[in-house]
Amino acid sequence: MDVRDRIRGGLTRVLVPTGGIEQNGPFVSLSKHNYIARAVSLRAAELLGSTLVAPVVPFVPQGNIKPPTGHMLFSGTISLKEKTFEALLEDIGASLAVHGFTEIVFLGDSAGNQRGMQKAAAQINKRFHQSPTRAFYIPEFYNYPELRKFLAQRGIEEHPEDFHEELAFSLQLLAISPPTLRYEQRIAAGHTTLGGLSLLDRDKLVALGKEIIEMRAQSSVKAIRERELMPERK
């Protein structure tokens, strides 16, 4: 009933974050992208105002299932077919539209999510073309070059670990929830550096993670505002 009342009160914009379940080496949570997608989306909603955030879509394309490719070569990964992912997003968007949301925004924290979100938004716009509903896909939410630039401006050069761990994402996790990075276990095991930075300077790393989350949220909000000004459906 809370959602119903908010919609009746004029709140008709909803963010739909997508994440993923994938291998990330011995320390990082399989749900890395889900934690980050939720945190950045919640901050973006705060900046936008009058915006709700739907539950994170946790399952996304991660490679062929059989024979396995991509992240599916590693245990713990869960993958969807591209057409399954697109259909899932379209049904989620349609459900939100039927209940009164007129602005449905897809945001994805992984490279494999992008095409499916773009196609789903297009299908929703086609399906609801006679209504006020519009769906948007925001690629600016996942802008890895921008993250690298952010680090470089602070004199930090990204050195990805051999087992698919990237500093920009680990910094966000440290700011969101240290256990998802197994922070204490790392220190106890003698792994006290990450991407050339000392994990012992925790406060500094948390501050960097919060800056990244804020930067991504602001970039996403800017992109959403720009899409809202477009007369055509994209």
Can you describe what each PLM-predicted range is?
Residues 1-105, 109-234:
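Extended, histidine- and acidic-residue-enriched regions that form the cofactor-binding/catalytic faces
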